[in-house]
């Protein structure tokens, strides 16, 4: 009866009311869930992070050129890109630090490797570390006479030539004992050495006249000397440093950038400009120029730091060594030949460098002005002065450069003497004297020396001064002056002067951000790999755009991501194919392989993460991971319309690992759900139910059901026994007859048959396993049926009550709205009536007041007008 009553009550709900309830519940659910956001994966976002990676070089080297730089570059570098691309990054500010730039360290290692290969030693000069018996050598003139070797440098033009004596070059003729081809025999040989390459033994004085003195080679007691196989020219060629795929080079284009700080004009490039690895001290040679003289200093208050001054115009430096000499080979042991000077014709060590005085004076003024502007905040009113190098090795106290294969050591003190520079003379050029040494202390390592064989003939080279290296001496507070002196020796500063505008960054194409889209369904689809090509630099072009604008170009950015790998692979393969007879697994070969493998590994790692998250082949991938508001307090609009991807990456970088783990767990759960869903597909066809492969499974299920029923029967029996024992009665067996009540309309038995005392009868329990199982299964099904029916009725009754409650609420809401509308109409009418009454009253009062004012004015006017009449009437009466 209750069920029928419930069904009748359910029918009272009309279809219109049910639809209305459903809409109300849906609106409530939408209102509740509209603020939820979900993690969305983006592939191809313009995000980068600072990194240190292995760069590779590119150059236009020609393998057929025997010059050592060409040979090295042809083996170590790939070809340059004929169409280099540079992309401006708008609205991007990046921090640069030239003194913490790993690119400088990499270039330093590479140039050390270049020098080790270029100045490759062949003969150890340990046999020459013997006592040398030397006497002063006389130079041979053209007419055959001999005289002291004095260098006279001609300056000025031909009409006003001045011969300036720079000094006397001491050349010694030394004899020593050398081992012959037979190790047990020695012979005495001689060779010419220059004073700078010798050092006297203890207690010996330099030779005078025809007297002899004992010497040994310079650095024989401190370094391991070797002799180069052949004289090399060491003419540097431009080398470009390039970032491997997956990385990029950021370049600062600010005009006032001084090496450290924020840069607002940033661009991205694949390779640097061509850098000539010129080894020199005091001056930067053959580098790049700036728009104005720029001072690069790490810390203006630190006197120990080297100051790099970049020029805005070049100063031409012309270096020459005239004369001629004769070279001979001296055997110093089995298969060892020392190449020395046999004789000298002319002033063979007449070495000097010249530069234009006007150009140098103007440049010097600009340098002084730039230093004043840079250090005025630190030095105050102190005057900046200049002076010569304060001391140290010859490579530091002199301008050390390579000219035509010879090592020049030039005295530059005259260039920093303001009294000479600003003195107006007729000389057009400034000449600085130079020395040439053949035993040279190598700059790349401590305790290494090399003997370079002399070169015949005249040597001339032209270099461009593009920068100066200074050291700030301690300030003289008494004289209120600060002195700057030229310095050098740390070749990293030479490379830093060219690389200070660059930095290496690692591209991070994977990004996560909150959106309102959620992954709803679980389905399988055919996924295609994203095609990638073109140039990868455009990938960072949208770095300054907001996240919403940048996400619209993800397709193009993702296509550009892998192109760097493809282009680099093809370039390297072409280089290997063209130079396979030269390219071996050297240091640079290992670096190239590292760069290639690293790029591919990073790309595969990103693709692996996308696969773990179920986003393979997708540029924008929604997920079912809810966005946690604790990760950021930014609103949806602030994130997508006010922030760039770089800013967003810094905002959530601390939670990236957490988000990645949640994405992986969500995808694992989704795959499990998908697997279970697919396993149910085999039951979609009825024919599959009778598949022979399922019979064993059916048998297993049957055995489980039977075992369960038996176990259930045993449990119920035990429970029944326990229950009856607790009641004080225990049945004799499970086959005890149960009395059953007889129907009322059935007649009783006759007396002969024993009769029955009442209308009850006994029925025996079922016997047999199948009957018992069937009875239990029937009872179980009936039990489940009754329970499910009751549950359904309860649910229907609940829905009915909820519907009635909602309808009552809607009716009451409608009545409340009608009542509110009536109230508003009533009070609106009352307010309208009151306003009209107020306006009428005000109008009447104003009208009455106006009439009174007009009447008073009229009376007052008439009184004034009647004054003459009253006067006349008064006079008339008086006269009468």
Curated annotation (Swiss-Prot):
Ranges for region V2: 174-220
Spans annotated as Fusion peptide: 528-549
Residue segments, region V3: 319-352
Motif (Di-leucine internalization motif): 879-880
Extracellular face of the membrane: 36-701
Region (V5): 479-487
UniProt xrefs under Pfam families: GP120, GP41
Coiled-coil region list: 650-684
V1 as annotated region, ranges: 134-173
Endpoints of the signal sequence: 1-35
Post-translation changes: Highly glycosylated by host. The high number of glycan on the protein is reffered to as 'glycan shield' because it contributes to hide protein sequence from adaptive immune system. Palmitoylation of the transmembrane protein and of Env polyprotein (prior to its proteolytic cleavage) is essential for their association with host cell membrane lipid rafts. Palmitoylation is therefore required for envelope trafficking to classical lipid rafts, but not for viral replication.
TM ranges: 702-722
Family from the record: Belongs to the HIV-1 env protein family.
Note: Inhibitors targeting HIV-1 viral envelope proteins are used as antiretroviral drugs. Attachment of virions to the cell surface via non-specific interactions and CD4 binding can be blocked by inhibitors that include cyanovirin-N, cyclotriazadisulfonamide analogs, PRO 2000, TNX 355 and PRO 542. In addition, BMS 806 can block CD4-induced conformational changes. Env interactions with the coreceptor molecules can be targeted by CCR5 antagonists including SCH-D, maraviroc (UK 427857) and aplaviroc (GW 873140), and the CXCR4 antagonist AMD 070.
HAMAP family linked to this entry: HIV_ENV
Protein name (record): Envelope glycoprotein gp160
Organism whose genome encodes this protein: Simian immunodeficiency virus (isolate MB66) (SIV-cpz)
Gene name for this UniProt entry: env
